[in-house]
């Protein structure tokens, strides 16, 4: 029996190679990308070349043919250096590509998956101004007209909105039917009536774009319905469950990165004639953080392996997301504390991680909603 955090050889090689790439190619650009709130374009090309943007796409479509667990390892390794990069790769794989693999027709898969393995970024458009946690209260509408669909509405908080060329958009074709009218559509950036609006100026994960999407009688071919008409709620629920594991991976990567910086700093920073890492109080705080991270990693890895084994993982996904998000915030806060004044300035890396950590308790299902999910599943 293999322990949860003991990786197979191919898993270890993937994690190490992705982290090596992140350390060499991403780390020198982190501060600049954060300040300008924009990814370096050349870096996106390198991520495609590395293979992480289509890691789960079958080899027959030009992808890596790897497992969901492999994508989780990649997100963790990238987020250890920059959680903004981690979430871009996460949305691409755990939300968009997974939805295409599960619900896309053969024609849809052939049309989009080879591009998503090479140069096409995806986004997932569910949230609206009045439907955040209450996702199925969405007001974007779709109506049949002249042999196609016409979408009208507005989406908010859409990750990858600035870079994406393909969007999974949820709209209601029959509002009287409630959530049973919700349908998932594949919208290309160039479709008539579609535009990307305001880009949000965020507290953290600033390089990752978060945008408004506008649909003004947007024309969508009938072939671009993902799954069945009226079954979009199922697409949304099931992909978000997987996405929560991806956010858990992002958060443990962030926490590990913060701890890495903290250990290195406390070995070098001297007060009262010795390194502050020699003081027992500091050592105990670091030991507790390391314990938290390992516990969070166990939860994330367990949820991911359950998903790959086709076993129920809804409760475990909620558990791993809420706990990993809390651990990330605690660890980043500890890093700022132990860096002292240096932790409060942009010259040092931990203030950014502190800002980045907060989003983990908000997106892809707030912590309160995760608690509700866990309670419902264990209490009935």
Region locations from a protein language model:
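Alpha-helical interface subdomain recognition
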Residues: 1-91, 103-108, 118-119, 132-135, ...
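Short Ser/Thr-interspersed hydrophobic loop/turn segments at strand-loop and sheet-helix junctions
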Residues: 51, 75-79, 171, 187-192, ...
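Helix-loop "lid/cap" segments that line or gate small-molecule binding pockets
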Residues: 95-102
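A short, Trp-centered hydrophobic/proline-enriched beta-strand micro-motif
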Residues: 118-127
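Short Gly/Pro-enriched turn/cap motifs at secondary-structure boundaries
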Residues: 130-133, 157-160, 173-176, 202-209
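Flexible, small-/acidic-enriched active-site or ligand-binding loops
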Residues: 137-139, 190-221
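A short core secondary-structure module
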Residues: 148, 152-196
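A short, charged helix-loop
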Residues: 211-238
